[in-house]
A protein has these predicted regions:
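Helicase P-loop NTPase motor core
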Residues: 1, 7, 66, 250-253, ...
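P-loop NTPase Walker
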Residues: 1-73, 77-78, 149, 173, ...
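Conserved helicase NTPase motor core
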Residues: 1-3, 22-23, 30-31, 50, ...
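Alpha-helical scaffold elements adjacent to nucleotide-binding pockets in ATP/GTP-utilizing enzyme cores
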Residues: 6, 33-41, 57-64, 86-89, ...
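Short glycine-/polar-rich loops that comprise or flank the Walker A/P-loop
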Residues: 16-20, 45-48, 83-86, 217-220, ...
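Conserved nucleotide-binding/hydrolysis micro-motifs of P-loop NTPases
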Residues: 28-31, 55-58, 112, 227-231, ...
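ATP-hydrolysis module of ASCE/P-loop NTPase motor domains
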Residues: 46-49, 67-156, 179, 254-261, ...
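Proline-centered turn/helix-capping motifs that create local helix->coil transitions or kinks
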Residues: 114-120, 206-210, 274-286
Length: 324
């Protein structure tokens, strides 16, 4: 809702051209809902905007300019099923022990490399332990097979787009000139590659200038996020992206949205007490105007089974109350 209203404000109040807006969220469903809301607010002009996921935005960039790397613009995109099938072949041909190196574990390792913008050559150079060397070798084999198939996997989409913008300043400047307003949702869930993409489009200190062309002023960047809600570290998300935002983008202004519209004050007071123990966070106190609500009940379970049974019983009781 915050991003949607911001976009509507840009177009209707500041007369921003819709085609200069890039809005990024994390799921196709969220992107579709955002597009619908913006169209409702500002009309069909909103269709000129790029409102998409990181992956979809990168696909559009790559379809235009990936041939700079000698890759066909009609490249295929491997989804998770395709990628797993290919990695299974890699693991089989490298005779990896499936118990020690399950296919999914190898895929996760390769995904982590790509999310950190580490190519297979660097992965091999930096591999210090036997498992790291195994993952680096699998990465190299996997990547060579992708190239032979004229394909990119999901992680390649973002990594390759970042490398493209870094390697060819004229391509980067083209998109910096087009997207004068960049908005990113759930910024606390971004990984290093996604962070790097945002910097290439918006930062004022990017390397490389197109000869004979003045450096484009950084785009106006707005991100929405909450460091207290960062839960995707296991997928490569780094909380430092939002914690260091003001240092990464000097002059940024932080607006704290501390009113909660879903929970009662008793719940929020407990949440405030728990989260206050986190280190290095911006202090905020969530509040609500929907009342104190019922007191929180604590229950100690003896086992995971007891815990699950308690939850099931509570849900069953609530359902009975609703139907009564």
């Amino acid at each position: 809702r915050v991003l949607t209203r911001r976009i509507a404000h840009l177009v209707s109040q500041r007369d921003v051209h819709p085609g200069s807006v890039l809005a990024i969220t994390f799921t196709n469903k969220a992107a579709a809902e955002m597009r619908e809301r913006v169209v409702e607010l500002v009309g069909n002009r909103a269709k000129l905007m790029w409102v998409s996921t990181f992956h979809s935005a990168c696909v559009r960039i790559l379809r235009q300019d990936i041939d700079r790397f000698g890759i066909t613009k009609t490249f295929s995109i491997y989804d998770d099923t395709d990628a797993k099938r290919l990695m299974s072949l890699v693991c089989r041909d490298q005779e990896l022990d499936p118990k020690r190196y399950p296919v999914r574990a190898v895929m996760n390792a390769v995904s982590n490399f790509k999310n950190e913008l580490i190519d297979y050559e660097r992965a091999a150079l930096e591999a210090a332990s036997p498992p790291q060397k195994v993952y680096a070798a699998a990465y190299a084999d996997y990547q060579s097979r992708l190239v032979a198939a004229h394909a990119l996997d999901f992680d390649d989409l973002i990594m390759t787009a970042v490398h493209l913008l870094q390697a060819f300043p004229d391509v980067r400047e083209k998109y910096r000139r087009r997207f004068r307003h960049v908005l990113v949702d759930e910024y606390q869930d971004t990984n290093h590659a996604q962070y790097a993409l945002v910097r290439e489009l918006c930062a004022g200190d990017v390397a490389g200038v197109v000869e004979g062309s003045p450096l484009v002023e950084p785009a106006e960047l707005m991100v929405v996020g909450d460091s207290d809600q960062s839960i995707y570290a296991f997928r490569g998300a780094t909380i430092r992206n939002i914690m260091d935002f003001e240092a990464d983008f000097p002059g940024a202004r932080t607006v704290v949205l501390d009113q909660n519209y879903r929970s009662t004050q008793n719940v929020l007071t407990a949440a405030n007490s728990v989260i206050a123990r986190n280190e290095g966070r911006r202090d905020k106190r969530l509040w609500s105007d929907i009342g104190e609500g019922e007191l929180i009940v604590g229950w100690g379970a003896d086992s995971e089974t007891d815990d699950a049974q308690f939850v099931a019983d509570e849900l069953e009781q609530l359902l009975h109350q609703i139907h009564e």
